[in-house]
Amino acid sequence: MFISIEEKMNKLICEKKYSDIVSAPPQGLGATQTNLQRLLRSLDTVGWSTHEETGRLDRRAFTRFATGSANIFSRRQVAEAETSAVSILIDCSGSMEAGNRIRTAQSVVIHLSKILQRSRVPFCVQGFRTSGESVYNNDFHMERPKFIRFKQWGQSLQSVVAKLGAIDQCAGGGTPDYSSLVNALEDISKREESRKILFILTDASGYIPEHMKHVQKMADTLGVTLIAIGIHSVDAIDCFVNSSAVNDISELAG
């Protein structure tokens, strides 16, 4: 079910590639970062409850005190913020090799990962492609997906920089899109955070819109926000409700 890439990648080269991408953020990325951090950051909301009979004396309530009222105090209230978890799923099928699509996806993932790290949001990154195995019966044919764990839940970003730097070396094989998305949705739905977001980066080559509608219904049922980023293709826009397309990393800042 999983593909190991550690033995095949050159760690030093991959770490340098990661560093080169991080050191060259697209112009305007700061605005994207600010908007995403605002969405994801967990902040407690602090307020005050007035007209209390105990607590901190409310100086604005002196008029009520003069008329004999006892509810002249206020209390500090803290509303616990929503917490977020993010899963990033990368299409590593053979079509992503065309036109440097996988490299664009790699750049998007690395910059997105840095934003999530700064926001202190737990996240994972994995790629998917076929394993060469298929399941058949009288009603359907399904390709078994294989996943590439670039970053698992709980791992620090610093510990996986080489793996993220190796993303562009991992494209090949078929596209088990439906089964991979279902697996990723089920995985993030088990997280304890109140807000769950699944990003999929794909060229959507060969995707069937009707299948993706079923995936969207599943995401809605599980309470997961599904966001597609089309890579060098607008096909993702036809397949997913929340979607956009980029041809270059600079468009991420748009």
Regions found by a protein language model. Give the residues of each.
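Acidic, glycine-rich A-domain
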Residues: 1-254
